[in-house]
Amino acid sequence: NIEVLCHSSIRINKEKVIYIDPFKINKNYNDADIIFITHDHYDHYSEEDIDKVIKEDTTIVISKDLLKKLLKKGINKNAIITVEPNEKYMVQGIKFETIPAYNTNKTFHPKENGWVGYSITLDDIRYYIAGDTDITEENRKVKCDVAFVPVGGTYTTDFKEAAQLINEIQPKIAVPIHYGSVVGTKQDATDFIKLLNPSIKGIILMKQ
């Protein structure tokens, strides 16, 4: 029910069909109940890929800075939820929280941009999608069952830093993302899993 389609592009088919940062989608699904976008970079906010998953009654959850782009694209304002970091929300009966996603030792994702990761609760399971981030004071406090974390380095945590974060927050399952397309390799994902505490199950879900 959970797929990493490419890079940081995730599809969850549970009580709702949810996409996070659809990117390089290779077919027309057009079945999204909710689309979550973490931030305004081409490999996370891709209008071409949104078109492949959106349907008539899809809700799109975005950071505030993306509102003008979506409205210009012709998306109905009533179908858009804008979010800020460190808040709790509800969309189509689904609870979610926003966790700040930013760099601490590089400049690609400034904290002041208000970009986010998401903690989404589905069937009483909390899924944390970290977004493009380093280890931060906020994400070190995240409580979740399943965590999707970037391991590719350069713009985000590398595999060692990602493992450090996961070993601290201790989800049941950890899934490496943000590699294999723009930056990072499958080896980064494999090395990440090797560094996890034995109590945490690391799973590679990347399709390509």
Regions found by a protein language model. Name each.
Residues 12, 39, 46, 96, ...:
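Divalent metal-coordination and catalytic microenvironments
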Residues 50-104, 116-118, 190:
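Portal/gating segments that form or line small-molecule/metal binding sites
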Residues 119-172, 176-184:
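Metallo-beta-lactamase
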Residues 20-21, 36-37, 97-101, 149, ...:
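Redox-cofactor binding/interface segments in oxidoreductases and associated redox assembly factors
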Residues 23-69, 81, 143-148, 170:
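Active-site metal-binding motif and surrounding structural segment of the metallo-beta-lactamase
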Residues 1-30, 81-143, 157, 206-208:
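Core dinuclear metal-dependent hydrolase active-site scaffold
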Residues 3, 74-90, 140, 163, ...:
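Binuclear metal-ion centers of metallo-dependent hydrolases, dominated by the metallo-beta-lactamase
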